[in-house]
């Protein structure tokens, strides 16, 4: 190829080329380049889109002068002879690209309809899969197919208008909200469809082949279900090509650019949703290490989930966590060191939870704060602004729904260890009547752990409000009524106790009541009497401490105020065995006892791990010793060994 004085050398790119130096020229496959300088060594200089630079000559081919422009219906457009109008070239290219968009939309719509009518609808009427699995496979593909038919009709209407009045970009923008909703929903369902394909691959493959699909049939179905993603990725490229050959003053140019940006964002969102749903499906189906409580499937459906970075109050350490929002709680998980599974870190009830969106600073970006009367303050940093918006919106909506279903009286200032009030019971003047059954809300009592997350959950029964209505009262901290067998013992206590309290412990009774013969027969055995005596000691200790607190605090409250339960002050009798073998009976608070028991459990777990490790090492050593002994015995019995050692 040589350049002559009569005509300039024009070439077409055979491959994409991306510049690595400032003096090089970038181009895409099919671009037309005007060569300005030909040098030996494989690098030429040329001009493309107003830029001049060097490019490899083996990436292009020469456009011969005999090649002429073709009609818009052809797939390629040849370089015109010298002197041909450039505007006509752009118009011809524009028509070619527009026709290509319309034809591929027709083809895509027919492919979706074919997958539905040939395979999925017959599969729905057959008994190969359950109705749930079939619905996972179909997803909302029917809605997408109907939408694509509407899109094709809209594009056809655009092409009927004169070129200067065609609004292809405006057509895409007007349908973008509906398209976004449909494709995001399809992406969210696709991981479940893939799971069904994997689990029932053999049955589905046989069914597809009976319907005329080529072998392997499962591959045909997998490809058909992936077509929406493949088509979505092509829109930005097609619109970019249309914009390149559009006149600068075309009224649709700005809408085309907006459509390109919208499709790029939609494609990125779809990929993110698919990854998030795949991770969510993995968490829900695989076992979680150190899991506590009921099975994760009993928590309901996942409202939202993502990977975040958390930082607990008073700590500088930041940890990566996976947060999953369920209807009534927020689940926190961490990934195992080798990313082979997930580890349970804790649950946070949405009841009483407060969400505060934070401004960006040097220490955190895209962050919000979780706080509450029963929740240790947690700083959550999201990966991007969209993730932050989703979390704040879902959590605020969830906490509002929870607060409506479980109405509570919010205190003005409450320490983190206290419990919020519970739903109001009927007025105290109806205390003699049968109490109304209410479902108490559960709360989490925070205590120190390796991850700083609350674990212990305590349920409290419905309580009566004080006579004087207040926004917050210590009477809301009283415990649930004792069980009826224990309540019978309370009846034998000092009758000087408040009659109002006794009415809560026992149903309305006659002034003088004697134990029946049946009750006397039940308590006749020695074992029953010993058990009752032990229970009575616990109740006596409780009543003694309660009376003492009531006497000390009588100056700060009315005498008619009911007794309260403060977890940090409530005492119980604990029997401990010291290291020297001496048994000591001590009085400890409930909180201290819970923490002490937790520490003991952790020590037992560590001891168990050490014993298990020692046992494994001993077993390995015994196996090695056994192998060595067998080898020695074999050598001793080997005749060849005897000859060599004579």
Curated annotation (Swiss-Prot):
Post-translational modifications: Phosphorylated on Ser-516 by CaMK1; enhancement of GEF activity and downstream activation of RAC1. Phosphorylated by PTK2/FAK1; this promotes interaction with RAC1.
Record-linked Gene3D superfamilies: Dbl homology (DH) domain (1.20.900.10), L1 transposable element, trimerization domain (1.20.5.390), Pleckstrin-homology domain (PH domain)/Phosphotyrosine-binding domain (PTB) (2.30.29.30), SH3 Domains (2.30.30.40)
Composition bias type Polar residues, residue spans: 415-428
GO biological process, one term: presynaptic actin cytoskeleton organization
UniProt xrefs under Pfam families: betaPIX_CC, PH, RhoGEF, RhoGEF67_u2, SH3_2
Domain DH residues, every copy: 93-273
Domain of life per record: Eukaryota
Record-level Gene Ontology MF annotations: gamma-tubulin binding; guanyl-nucleotide exchange factor activity; protein kinase binding
SUPFAM superfamilies: DBL homology domain (DH-domain), PH domain-like, SH3-domain
Domain PH: 295-400
Domain SH3 residues, every copy: 6-65
Keyword vocabulary terms for this entry: Cell junction, Cell projection, Cytoplasm, Guanine-nucleotide releasing factor, Neurogenesis, Phosphoprotein, SH3 domain
UniProt xrefs under InterPro entries: BetaPIX_SH3, DBL_dom_sf, DH_dom, GDS_CDC24_CS, GEF6/7_CC, PH-like_dom_sf, PH_Cool_Pix, PH_domain
A cellular-component GO term for this protein: mitotic spindle pole
Positions of region (Disordered): 402-464, 500-520
List of residues that carry Phosphoserine: 7, 71, 79, 340, 516, 560
Biased composition (Basic residues): 500-512
Location of the protein in the cell: Cell junction, Focal adhesion; Cell projection, Ruffle; Cytoplasm, Cell cortex; Cell projection, Lamellipodium
Quaternary assembly: Interacts with SCRIB; interaction is direct and may play a role in regulation of apoptosis. Interacts with PAK kinases through the SH3 domain. Interacts with GIT1 and probably TGFB1I1. Interacts with ITCH and PARVB. Interacts with FRMPD4 (via N-terminus). Interacts with CaMK1. Interacts with PTK2/FAK1 and RAC1. Interacts with BIN2. Interacts with YWHAZ. Interacts (via PH domain) with NOX1 (via FAD-binding FR-type domain).
Function field: Acts as a RAC1 guanine nucleotide exchange factor (GEF) and can induce membrane ruffling. Functions in cell migration, attachment and cell spreading. Promotes targeting of RAC1 to focal adhesions. May function as a positive regulator of apoptosis. Downstream of NMDA receptors and CaMKK-CaMK1 signaling cascade, promotes the formation of spines and synapses in hippocampal neurons.
Protein name: Rho guanine nucleotide exchange factor 7
Organism encoding this protein: Rattus norvegicus (Rat)
